[in-house]
Amino acid sequence: MVWNVEREFGPNCAFPLWAEIAEARRLVMYDGLGSGLSDRSFEDISIENSVADLAAVVDAAGLEKFAICSSCMGAQAAISYAAAHPDRVEKMVLIGGFSRGLMHRQPTAKQIAQRELMLEALEIGWDDPIPAFRLLDQLSAFPQATLEEQLRMTEMLQSTTSGRNTVKYFRAQSETDVSSQARHVQCPTLIAHARESARIPFDEGCRLAGLIPNAQFLPLDGKDTVPTPSNPAFRVVVDATRAFLQEGDLGSAGNGLGVHLTPREGEVLELMAQGLDNLQIAAHLGLSEKTVRNHITPIFDKLSVDNRGRAIVKAREAGLGLRRA
């Protein structure tokens, strides 16, 4: 997919969703061929080659079993890979995804004309210092995002690839249908889709959920293809995805507390039970003190306590805090 990992882990991150979802997990991201730090001169952009990109990254990272999280244009490659490698993909999350591109949905003449107009505007205006043409894409995909968020996304995309390659990515996904592959996906799958999605119709999300056996479907309020932080659906999809990915994680269900804690929350509570304060916990885990506080709030909620002392009592009653950091 079109991405720029180097930029996305800086202070001006345009798409913070994945980092939020992957907290306390290993997150592997990559720049697809034709974008980011990968070969920008690569011309043969297709869903098949996007699948090959994904396979190469998986092998290079030494991943034996893992979860795939994808959105929008990356969903087709994720579906294809998961169907072909059921022994490696444990879970899959698709946000604003689809199996069939526009040209496989019996588009009207108006829809085709609108697509061609937008693609022409993107290619011609991609390098303009004024982002008007690039904003056409963001306005259709993220109509609820703030102007600041939209501008940040256009800046990230412009720094990532060329207008020509962007158009190639759009054409590749709009002319591809992976519905048959979706039927062969075997892993548990969560599909989240905005009810009023301006880019990918809600019906396409529902259809995809019907194709993948036993998929879970999460309808989201709003119009953004993928919710941005200013959208209330952002927190909904982050929390739902975390819960979906953590189901069955060792140390969560069997912690003796009778509640489901994330791995990071479990670490924080263990250190609290050992008597460490927030500053000491932050140093031990390599986090900021603010991040530690942000973990403690949901711990209190899950334990149904209103202060640190009561949380520590519950933790020690469950056998936590016996080790020393």
Regions inferred by a protein language model and the residue ranges of each:
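Flexible "cap/lid" loop of the alpha/beta hydrolase fold
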Residues: 79, 83-84, 89-124
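Conserved alpha/beta-hydrolase catalytic His-Asp/Glu region
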Residues: 126-172, 181
